[in-house]
């Protein structure tokens, strides 16, 4: 019994010595990477801290985890007996061989374990490196996304700022455009008002000018009519009575019989003929005014107004004033020089000479062409109008002046 206690103490001392030779206990034992059985202690190598192994009680248990128990007889024989040729020694020698095999197997298992530990360590290192790489990539990715998010946010803010600035510029430009347009509209209204005022002034001036011209025309026509009336009254024949009233007519008739025609006669004939043709409607109109109730004149006037273009009010006023002056002049002329009183009978006998008769007929034809009231054959001789040419000249002059004013004002 005492020998066993001593053996255990020796084994403990031996184990302590082994532990102190480059190894150390794992503390706490629960951190051991392998499970030691039968009271084995877990130790780690100082040079390789990741390598763990089990220290068994010497002579009691063996194996990489202290799982093999050593027989007690072998232990007692080894501790108490000497080396003899006793059969027990042979058994002891055989047990030592088994122990060597067990140690060899332990070494192999230890090497395998070390290899596994190294492989596991390598894998763990690779895993750590892989995890580190992944963490680094993750951090880089997170940093990239942070930077990208910040950049996009900055771009969005910049775009929003540009949009706001563009909107402000557009509003300012729109306000300027509205202000310019309002100014242009105001200037246009002012110009339009000035133009209308100038047009009104021009129209008023034109109306005043036309009124002045109309008054001047009326005055000139009245003055000219008065002059012509005075001239006609001065040139009127004064008859003393009896047979002495016809010498001038006889002389004039002799001139026509002789075929004597001057240039003045031709001019008067042509002018009188043209003027008579132009004034014939006016004379007929004046006769219609004196003879009937004016219905034909109104109808003819309506037809003429339908055929012609519309006349301005100023021209109508001027034409009405001229017509009034013209009608007044015709009435005055007819009153002062009645046609019935100017007729007389030619008591001279007819000439028998065919040449004289031919010349007389030619003169009569010219006189008839020139005057509407020509010579007419009566029961006692030829009837002539004494004042017809003078009246026609006065009426022709008045009509010509009136027509000239009318055409000048209308066209």
Swiss-Prot record:
The keyword Signal applies. Disulfide bonds join 32-42, 36-54, 56-66. Keywords: Disulfide bond, EGF-like domain, Signal. InterPro entries: EGF-like_dom. SUPFAM superfamilies: EGF/Laminin. Residues 267-276 have a biased composition (Low complexity). This is Uncharacterized protein T05G5.1. Residues 78-312, 337-375 are annotated as: Disordered. Residues 78-97 have a biased composition (Polar residues). The lineage of its organism: Eukaryota, Metazoa, Ecdysozoa, Nematoda, Chromadorea. It comes from Caenorhabditis elegans. The keyword Signal applies. Residues 1-21 form the signal peptide. Residues 237-266 have a biased composition (Acidic residues). Gene3D superfamilies: Laminin. Residues 28-67 form the EGF-like domain. Residues 100-230 have a biased composition (Basic and acidic residues).
